[in-house]
Amino acid sequence: SKRRDMTVFSGLFLGGLPPELRSATLKLTLSSVKDREPFKGWITDVRVNYTQTSPVESQEVRLDDEQSRLCAREDVCLNGGVCSVLNDQAVCDCSQTGFRGKDCSEEDNYVEGLAHLMMGDQGKSKGKEEYIATFKGSEYFCYDLSQNPIQSSSDEITLSFKTLQRNGLMLHTGKSADYVNLALKNGAVSLVINLGSGAFEALVEPVNGKFNDNAWHDVKVTRNLRQHSGIGHAMVNKLHCSVTISVDGILTTTGYTQEDYTMLGSDDFFYVGGSPSTADLPGSPVSNNFMGCLKEVVYKNNDVRLELSRLAKQGDPKMKIHGVVAFKCENVATLDPITFETPESFISLPKWNAKKTGSISFDFRTTEPNGLILFSHGKPRHQKDAKHPQMVKVDFFAIEMLDGHLYLLLDMGSGTIKIKALQKKVNDGEWYHVDFQRDGRSGTISVNTLRTPYTAPGESEILDLDDDLYLGGLPENKAGLVFPTEVWTALLNYGYVGCIRDLFIDGQSKDIRQMAEIQSTAGVKPSCSRETAKPCLSNPCKNNGVCRDGWNRYVCDCSGTGYLGRSCEREATILSYDGSMFMKIQLPVVMHTEAEDVSLRFRSQRAYGILMATTSRESADTLRLELDAGRVKLTVNLDCIRINCNSSKGPETLFAGYNLNDNEWHTVRVVRRGKSLKLMVDDQQAMTGQMAGDHTRLEFHNIETGIITERRYLSSVPSNFIGHLQSLTFNGMAYIDLCKNGDIDYCELNARFGFRNIIADPVTFKTKASYVALATLQAYTSMHLFFQFKTTSLDGLILYNSGDGNDFIVVELVKGYLHYVFDLGNGANLIKGSSNKPLNDNQWHNVMISRDTNNLHTVKIDTKITTQSTAGARNLDLKSDLYIGGVAKEMYKSLPKLVHAKEGFQGCLASVDLNGRLPDLISDALFCNGQIERGCEGPSTTCQEDSCANQGVCLQQWDGFSCDCSMTSFSGPLCNDPGTTYIFSKGGGQITYTWPPNDRPSTRADRLAIGFSTVQKEAVLVRVDSSTGLGDYLELHIHQGKIGVKFNVGTDDIAIEEINAIINDGKYHVVRFTRSGGNATLQVDNWPVIERYPAGNNDNERLAIARQRIPYRLGRVVDEWLLDKGRQLTIFNSQATIKIGGKERGHPFQGQLSGLYYNGLKVLNMAAENDANIVIEGNVRLVGEVPSSMTTESTATAMQSEMSTSVMETTTTLATSTARRGKAPTKEPIGQTTDDILVASAECPSDDEDIDPCEPSSGGLANPTRAGGGREYPGSSEVIRESSSTTGMVVGIVAAAALCILILLYAMYKYRNRDEGSYHVDESRNYISNSAQSNGAVIKEKQPNSAKSSNKNKKNKDKEYYV
């Protein structure tokens, strides 16, 4: 029966059945027992489940204790005879002992019918010799049965064994489908019997432990002919063989052979302890010979008794002994397990000579998913075929683990087979027994008891292996090794980590522990144990490495960290690429792979660029990673057409990630296994794909980064890479670090090691009239632009391309801020780049501008990002040339309205990426204009802390720098020359400057500086007065030897004084005064700045906050109200005269005055040059000549410096006022703004760089300059020019009542026609031309949609004033 378990529903009856079971209505499973006669006689030694038991109930049975008494003595029955009591006497049953006699003490050595096997009397049992032999794996007995074949229906096999090995053949006879096989299998006793039509298999295992415990165990196998009820529709009884196997007399398994074959016939050999090829024996569950001791191996049947152990020792002519056998029990060296602790460890075994047949068996145990366990290959042979390229082929054999599954790989020259040995994963930490057997083209691979057959393709039956057989991995120096593409673990550098034991090759044991010691193999431990603690619990992976528990080790995935090493402790090398750089790995031999593991980290600001590619010199094969529109694109092309595949579908592509050109580190991983592809970026979900076609082999000679140099088979060349690469690992090889450390000598590179700022192909536009024209920008559906720039200019056109209809794109600098202007057909749009400060700081800045297919526009400047979505048209249809750096002079007038530029870009551009194209701005130019040079030297001299003397302000310019000496009292290029100096003698004198009646300024902020020396205790140095009747004034004076200032701007007198500095000591002193509204500062020489804040300023702050929330259309009304408030509280109205010397005030000054500066006017210079508006009277004398700082070379700079001043200096009062509330005071920065240009009342609030129009305002500020520190502040002199003379004002007031309606209509008309006037700013001259200015109060501006003027700077000044 095939069923091993029996279900029992009744008691166990001995000797017969009770009457109730004989009822005719009761159906029994075996109905014939009802008709059997009850047993009469003795039944002794009753055991159930191996234990003695007592009956529960009996009928007509006498329980006799006499047997226990008579059989109690140990010497009643010897040699295992069974004692029973008959007629009150002890009787021995010797039938199962091989002995005879009353007490089973006489050896039964007569065998009927086989006279040659008759043996003499061996004496009594006590003197009986035991026949023992020791087998060490290569020895065995072979008894020839050819002269006396066995034909039996009942037989018995007995033997005893002692071993430490888990597997081994103990006995075998028969061949083909008629055999008996007894073996030790994984520590259990295995019996396989086949009588011609099917095998009976039994496996006896101990309850605890294994039989390979180095103790003696007795095995007995019996086979008897019995009648057995058939199962099925026939329901007939047949004669079957009952088979019983017992170990140590208590472990018994019973079953029946299949069908009705009852005879065992054998004319072959009896093998004991092994065979010449155990793996090839029919039915053999093991492939190796026995290692240990065998005792008293006996086979007997009705006709013959073969004492095989005795015959071997006595040298029977039919018994052949192979090997040197010791006929005694010796200790056999155990095959100790070993542990491969690292993927790099391995053992080299001798060449496996298994051309026709062979077998390998071993046990393994691991928790790791991947590893090469066994590998060997034959001599390389070149395969040439008209349809195939020349390639190297080898015979090979491999057993590997991939993803937890065990695979057999074999190629005998006619094609490769790859067999998954087991469907379940085998990396669960348990022991698995692997047995590989082959005979020609066919064979099996079995794991534990599950066997998988195979048949190799083609006709070749010879496995020609010529190299060593490697166990556990491969040597680091793989020169001379040929790795077939099908052996993925070899190409992926996956060494095996785990335990191996009991390695047998062709039935011969291999002491791999001893081999490891001889080879001094690192990372091999002569034991196997599994640690219970999980290694990752201690967080061994540093720098955010991802930990995985391996076999008694932790495994760190460092691919996303930028570090290398077992614990991610070593920083990985960075390579910097500038678009002309590369690293190329030229492999020593052509590689063919079917599986790849690729990982790398990159950082780039470009949306396009090649990251890594494998290339071939002979095919289009490639595995390529590149940036494509900010995403990672994987392309795999296996050149199926070239090798004549039938189902080529072209390259496979996968995309992953988004906006990866953000100048941050990103990690890319690629895993290919045959046709399966997986692409991962950072921690995002993996993208997967399946390759079409039957071809899976990738050929490559090179691994390239930065630039693809092998372009012969490329239909299109990817853009060069600009950025940084790190941790490039291809199939376990960290190539960047291998190249840097000199570990490999096949690197070629010009990329630079280390993290470096990338400035690729810089070009200098030396003048604002310089520009280049390139081919039309291709940005129809989407766009990715990138460039770097460096400049000191506030304004300039960087990029311009026009197109069909109104389509265009512009990138420009406006007041130091970047603007992106475009029109896709729905009207022009402006996006202002975000930056903390103006970008004209002579530093490199990175700019990325993109537009995706959903019309999401992104502007990124360094790390600041601005986005905006637009509706409507989605395509940018450009047609004409692309201009870089500017356009022709006559084209500025026709630029779109939102474009501010009136001149070109002066400075450097680099790393220009035009939607994936890297143009050479000079070589690729259709034409060039002006001075354009390669490289970027920048200003030959730059502003340093000590560039300008005496607290002069350094102004960086592209061709150098200049010094603003306005507030120093000195002059000259570096503010270290004396300023214009007058001496006021005894009796006093005075220099008076008078503004023209129609040009008297009103200011919110004033700046005054002068140098002097005197010994007076009382004197007036400078006084500024307003027009008659207004009463506003400002006076710089000496009182009791201390310098001070008094001023009145419409309310009360305000005074500020430096009380600590003695200034009437005859030494030269410089005094600086600033005013912003009612706030004021005063500084003498290098003494700390004195600050003064009148009460009520919080009102202005609250008004400034409220002003930002005032509706757009009400802006003008509020502006006028705020202006009126300003006239009362903060504005120095209608300034008329500047009087120097104080003669009129009764305290004439005596001493020296130098370098007077007031709101852009250098009055002493003007006096020395005989200015018509200056009157000199009294004892005043010019010292020397006018300083010659106004040379021809520096006229423009000097004028600009004299007419302008630091932006933030004018707001020192404001800044320091907030400092008293806990904010840091503001230094005087580098910057400039024109002083004497008209500015409007408080304008609509906006961002600093905003140039959007608001409600009608007055003209603009020429040459606005930003401070290096951030927000824009009021200029040195915010001037409100009087629109008419005082007489005109009187007439206007008188006529106001009569002309009220007319004035209102006129104002409305002017508001609705804001584009009547325009102005042009010339930075080098500081003047306003083409100004449509009547004799009114303000200069009108163009309407909002026209090109904007720079008056926005003045708007911000008003806003900053209120803050």
Swiss-Prot record:
Disulphide linkage map: 71-83, 77-92, 94-104, 293-329, 499-528, 536-547, 541-556, 558-568, 908-936, 943-954, 948-963, 965-975
Residue ranges occupied by any EGF-like domain in the UniProt entry: 67-105, 532-569, 939-976
Region: Disordered, residue numbers: 1244-1280, 1330-1363
Biological process annotations from GO: cell adhesion
Any one cellular-component term (Gene Ontology): membrane
Pfam families listed in its UniProt record: EGF, Laminin_G_2, Syndecan
Membrane topology: Single-pass type I membrane protein
Side of membrane Cytoplasmic, spans: 1309-1363
Residues annotated for Ca(2+) binding in this entry: 178, 195, 263
Extracellular-side segments: 1-1287
Keyword list, A-Z: Calcium, Cell adhesion, Disulfide bond, EGF-like domain, Glycoprotein, Membrane, Metal-binding, Repeat, Transmembrane, Transmembrane helix
Subcellular location: Membrane
Residues carrying a glycan: 49, 646, 1079
InterPro entries linked to this entry: ConA-like_dom_sf, EGF-like_dom, EGF-type_Asp/Asn_hydroxyl_site, Laminin_G, Neurexin-like, Neurexin-related_CASP, Syndecan/Neurexin_dom
TM regions (residue ranges): 1288-1308
Entry's Gene Ontology molecular function annotations: metal ion binding
Post-translational modification: N- and O-glycosylated.
Family according to the record: Belongs to the neurexin family.
Role summary: Neuronal cell surface protein that may be involved in cell recognition and cell adhesion. May mediate intracellular signaling.
Name of protein: Neurexin-1
Originating species: Gallus gallus (Chicken)
Gene designation: NRXN1
